[in-house]
Amino acid sequence: MTVPDSVGTFAAQAVVAFRRAKGAPDSLALDLVGLTVDSVTAPGASRAARQERRPFAYDGRKLRIGLRPRRGTGVESVVVFYHGAPADGLFLRPDARGRPSAFADDWPDRARDWLPTVDDPADKAPVRWEVSVPAGWRVVANGRFVRRDAAGGGRATWTYDERSPIPTYTMVLGAGRMTASRHRPAVLGNDSVPIEVWAEPEDSAFADSVPFRRATEIVETMERLVGPFPFEKLAEVESSTRYGGMENSTAIFYPEQPYVARRLSEGVVRHETAHQWFGDAVTERDFHDLWLSEGFADYFAVVVGAALDGDSVMRRGVAGLMRGYLRSPVVGRPLVDSAETVLTRLLNANSYNKGACVLHMLRRTVGDSAFWRGIRAYYREYRDSSVSSADFQRVMERAAGRQLGWFFTEWLHQPGYPQLDVAWRWDSAGRRLSIDVTQTQPAAWGLFTLPALTLEVAGGSGPPIQRTIALSSARQSVQWDAPERPTDVRVDPDGDWLLTAQVHSQP
């Protein structure tokens, strides 16, 4: 790919490798939007014809390439020569200080605006970049840095190679006048992961000392919790992404504005780093299962923060996730919302906050040992591939040694959350406390099962008394001895469950 010296068009040739499925037609369809296709070639039928032109049809959205009749089951390839000014996906524009730059930004389906691909999260592929830029520029991209070659005309070509299959929405490059610093590598056993911080020169000191100060420790913590880092390096990059952070494989892009304002937080860094495991290495097969990416990243941002800074981070973090969901406009829709057709609308509190809370509640349901056994098995089994919520459920059921269909049905496919009315009364004659718990959420949300709901009763001179009940019906009553009248009854005092509760006493 040739990136221009200033804002304008680019030119590229893409080598697309593929295998034909049995019975597939003698053609290849690629997503490519709004560019000019100059020609398409493929290896010739003989050694004398090393490359030959292939017929193609291009309607501005789909590129259909005619292929020779299938000659086996091996890997084939075509080369697409094209150019243009992308309307989206690859942004050739000035950086925050007015210098020319180029940055890709592909989620959810904008790789097709500049790359001829099968632009679908279920179709992952390795990628190799050879990017020609002005000699004073630097280039960052997916994978291992291979080399920088000087070229004529005051230009240089940078080569990167990512050998693991990654989703097209994380296939990116960034180019411009940037600085790059190396932090201490992340080490797990005999493996070492280079950690790089890329920024505009004016922002490099801030980037190194504030948001990415513990970038290495974050990676090492994730490795201990989940498994080995899945790629060759991790670069933290100041860019022109439209998102608060974009988890591109091996090269996370962050927007310029928080750098300029000196407000980029470590919480965002933990979230995006967690995506390297969940989203990049293990990718949702369908965007309606986006919680497998965003919910995981939100939860592990909190878990890693707690591992680094103490359990209070866990309590505050989970409580914040729950508050964010309960205040959101999507509580009336299921987490896995297959009716939503606008993909960007899936970037909501269901996919993020509720998805993270589902993991926390699953952990409370099966216990720490089974939860972590399942998480590690899930990553190990599905690394470098694509998954569904059903795949995750199967792994967790195996780890827990029991069926969890009720849990995933209620929390993924039913909308809403439990709304509880909790009425208590104290019998002074019998010294007994009675508590009635009623689910009052809209009928369309259905009922929820809370297998270990804690009730805490305070009163008298002694410490609060806690009892755990299994709530599995619309209404449940419990009684126990209470020598003194309670002064307070609390529901789920540790914040383990995504719910609301109205507590009141009865005469």
Q: Across the structure, where does each feature detected by a protein language model lie?
A:
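N-terminal, polar/Ser/Thr-rich
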Residues: M1-A11, G23, A96-G98, R112, ...
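Surface-exposed beta-strand/loop patches in extracellular or lumenal glycoproteins
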Residues: A11-T36, L115-D119, A125-P134, A390, ...
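Hydrophobic helix-coil surface modules that form long, contiguous segments used
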Residues: A12, D105-D109, T117-R270, D298-V302, ...
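A surface-exposed beta-strand-loop module
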Residues: S27-L28, L32-G98, G152-T159, L471-R485, ...
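Beta-strand-rich binding/interaction modules
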Residues: T36-P43, V140, L404-G405, P418-D492
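Glycine/proline-rich low-complexity spacer/linker segments in large multi-domain proteins
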Residues: G72, F81-R128, G176, S181-R184, ...
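Acidic/His/Gly-enriched intrinsically disordered linker/tail segments
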Residues: R163, R263, E294-M361, T365-V366, ...
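Amphipathic alpha-helical substructures
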Residues: E340, N348-D436, G446
